[in-house]
Amino acid sequence: MKLRFQRVALVGKYQAPTSAGMSDSSRDALDGIARFLANEGCEVALEADTAANTGFTDYPALSVERIGLDCDLCLVVGGDGTMLGVGRQLAQYRTPLIGINQGRLGFITDIPLGEYPTVLKPMLRGEYEEDLRPLMRARVMRQGQCVFEALAMNDVVVNRGSTSGMVELRVEVGGHFVSNQRADGLIIASPTGSTAYALSAGGPMLHPTIPGWVLAPIAPHTLSNRPIVLSDSMEVAVEVVSGRDVSANFDMQSLASLQHGDRILVQRSDYRARFLHPRGWNYFATLRKKLRWNEGGY
């Protein structure tokens, strides 16, 4: 069967430190996958930082932008954090992504490392399930000016510093005042992020096809302050009323320090990440496996 993807880029989890910047297991995994892809007839490229940290010179090194412009597919080898970082950058190019899990839980990097040869072979020829995930656009406004802007796939989190007390946040949804919340922080999560930090804060899991967000307080002062499910068509505004060392995190990978009076505006982005899964994949099977439902015969 003819290849569906000719030019394939590899991105590795190079944050695992060794003297060379990447663990031996990660380097070996990338080497094996690159050789597999080449044997399948693909033109293989490496993301520039991945190439630098592996020391591999047999394949061209491309920036993420060039991957988006020139490659048919991006294979991410690592955990969900690696996929989030790459997925945000490639969403504007509509480049499909496949995740090979070298992390722990792996909700969106769902192919086990030891199974990639048998799983990838049919996927490279067009046998896959496509899964579109919306992104969030967040801006930090200070005295009417945007001082920071970022995309998020999982969540936008406004929270206190590690040594400070509660923060007070004024929350508006769709231009309507909701409440002033005193808590350790507030999470605005997408369906993808609803199984991450928001879940540990008591929020519900949203199916990926639901056009909604979860608004979940972190350790609220008032117990009646519960998570809310919102339409993602509405802008969420969070204003810092009081608190010390307050910050906004975007997928826990970029951070903005906040001042009193700052407003964080969160809107649905025009971009969506394109994840590809093996044929037969479904969301509920992922939940059942990752959250260990039905183990022990129940």
UniProtKB/Swiss-Prot annotation:
First-listed, main subcellular location of the protein, grouped into a coarse class: cytoplasm
One Pfam family recorded for the sequence: NAD_kinase
SUPFAM superfamilies hit by this protein: NAD kinase/diacylglycerol kinase-like
Keywords, ordered alphabetically: ATP-binding, Cytoplasm, Kinase, NAD, NADP, Nucleotide-binding, Transferase
Coiled coil: none
Family of the protein in this entry: Belongs to the NAD kinase family.
Top-level taxon: Bacteria
Signal sequence bounds: none
Organism lineage: Bacteria, Pseudomonadati, Pseudomonadota, Betaproteobacteria, Burkholderiales
Cofactor(s), names only, from the UniProt record: a divalent metal cation
Name the record gives this protein: NAD kinase
Reactions mediated catalytically: NAD(+) + ATP = ADP + NADP(+) + H(+)
InterPro entries noted in UniProt: ATP-NAD_kinase_N, ATP-NAD_kinase_PpnK-typ_C, NAD/diacylglycerol_kinase_sf, NADK
Any one GO molecular function term: NAD binding
